[in-house]
Regions:
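N-terminal targeting or regulatory segments adjacent to alpha/beta-hydrolase or S9 domains
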Residues: 1-39
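Active-site loop/oxyanion-hole signature of alpha/beta-hydrolase fold enzymes
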Residues: 66, 110-156, 160, 164, ...
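Aromatic pocket-lining residues of Rossmann-like dinucleotide-binding sites
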Residues: 103, 168-172
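Flexible "cap/lid" loop of the alpha/beta hydrolase fold
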Residues: 170, 177-213
């Protein structure tokens, strides 16, 4: 079960109108079938987990001794225009909250978000992780949803999600009507992130492996890489209390980290 105990939600932590009480009622009602979600249940049309990669992950490499692994997804809206948003390294699909809120309420769209293998509500098989493997995982979800028509999906990927998107375009090019790539790269031995970003990734992953450090410190480092310092230090133009963007964003990231723990 989750370990989050905050009395109120930080603004922007979950769907518009969400309360701690509503989220807890949903958790209690679903019992053993519960998977943490920040998205609006009012726009939810389908969700996982589903079994994927049964032909690629042998039983001795899965968490439960069966071929493949359980992959979590949520589909919001029921419109004819299909959108999929792919998240980056070590982040859950919760990061697409604003996009799901916006497009999920629009009757023209169906919007798909998912947790990549190894993070969030998705299993972590004991095997090599590659962008081609991630791409095939997403393709399995498409197959499950029936998103197989030519030029029927608009693809969006950020950071590592952009790399997965590029791999999907290479392997399944006929599926996509468009591709939007955010803060990403096509890959190259000499095309590395800035030293600051590399240092953050190495330190954070190392701390998680050995159980050192704190979520708060890791999240602070992530914010310093994701956002410009001048923006973090600036007063938010929409906050009535005059807080900085850092003061508003940090509690959201920390709350989501705690909330996502099952």
């Amino acid at each position: 079960m989750t370990s989050w105990t905050e009395a109120e939600l930080p603004p922007g932590a979950a769907y518009r109108g969400a309360t701690v009480e509503a989220l807890k009622r949903r958790r209690d009602a679903e019992g053993d079938k519960y998977f943490p979600s920040v998205f609006n249940p009012g726009t939810l049309s389908r969700r996982g987990p589903i079994r994927v990669a049964e032909d690629r992950i042998p039983a001795n490499k899965s968490q439960d001794g069966r071929p493949g692994f359980n992959m979590y997804y949520e589909l919001h809206g029921e419109g004819p225009i299909h959108l999929v948003f792919l998240m980056g390294l070590n982040n859950s699909c919760f990061g697409w909250l604003d996009q799901v809120d916006e497009f999920g309420h629009d009757p023209r769209y169906s919007v798909l978000v998912l947790d990549n293998r190894g993070y969030g509500n998705t299993d972590a098989p004991h095997t090599r992780y590659t962008t081609s493997a991630f791409a095939d995982d997403v393709a399995d979800v498409f197959q499950h949803l029936g998103w197989t028509e030519p030029r029927s999906v608009h693809l969006v990927g950020v950071s590592m999600g952009g790399m997965i998107a590029l791999e999907m375009c290479r392997r399944y090019s006929e599926r996509f009507a468009s591709a939007t790539l955010l803060s990403t790269t096509a890959g190259d031995a000499h095309n590395l992130p800035p030293i600051k970003g590399l240092g953050m990734i190495v330190l954070s992953v190392s701390e998680q492996i050995v159980g050192a450090g704190s979520p708060l410190n890791r999240i602070k480092r992530v914010l310093d890489v994701l956002f410009p310092q001048e923006w973090l230090d600036a007063k938010s133009p929409t906050d009535p209390h005059g807080r900085t963007n850092r003061e508003l964003v940090l509690p959201v990231f920390l709350w989501r980290f705690n909330f996502a723990r099952r």
